[in-house]
Amino acid sequence: MKTLIVSGGNVGKEILNKTIKNNNFNNIIAVDKGLEILDECKIQPNYIIGDFDSVNQKIISKYNEERTIKLNPEKDFTDTHMAIKLAIEKKSDYIVVLGGIGTRIDHTIANVHILKECIENKIRCEIIN
């Protein structure tokens, strides 16, 4: 199973559309602000996860709460880390993360570090910036 995780970093329409076109994703997970670019491109995520501190509330209100996972803003992990855990739980064997690097150094370091969790679970994972 292939999963695309769209995080809150800088993701352009071109790279998003190219990544989707070149892969046959079974699941798309929007992470907090990552929902905005998916919404702009009219791409429906299967899951939305985050503490929703950075996404436009008008956008998130358009989506089904049934597939929305709201996280506590006071936590010891990033929203993207929880998206990786969700992808692993859904039996993904290939995970692509868009927008996981660049905007915040603490999140960049954490997101690179969570690749270890994929390796430990024998899951192919890549971060595309």
Regions found by a protein language model. Give the residues of each.
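Short glycine-rich or small-residue beta-strand-to-loop segments that form or flank ligand, phosphate
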Residues: 69, 95-100
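Hydrophobic anchor at the start of a short beta-strand
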Residues: 45-46, 95, 125
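Class I SAM-dependent methyltransferase SAM-binding "motif I" and its flanking Rossmann-like core
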Residues: 116-129
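N-terminal beta-strand-loop-alpha-helix module at the start
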Residues: 1-62
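Short phosphate-binding loop-to-helix
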Residues: 68-90
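Short Gly/Thr/Asp-enriched flexible loops that form oxyanion-binding sites at enzyme active sites
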Residues: 106-116
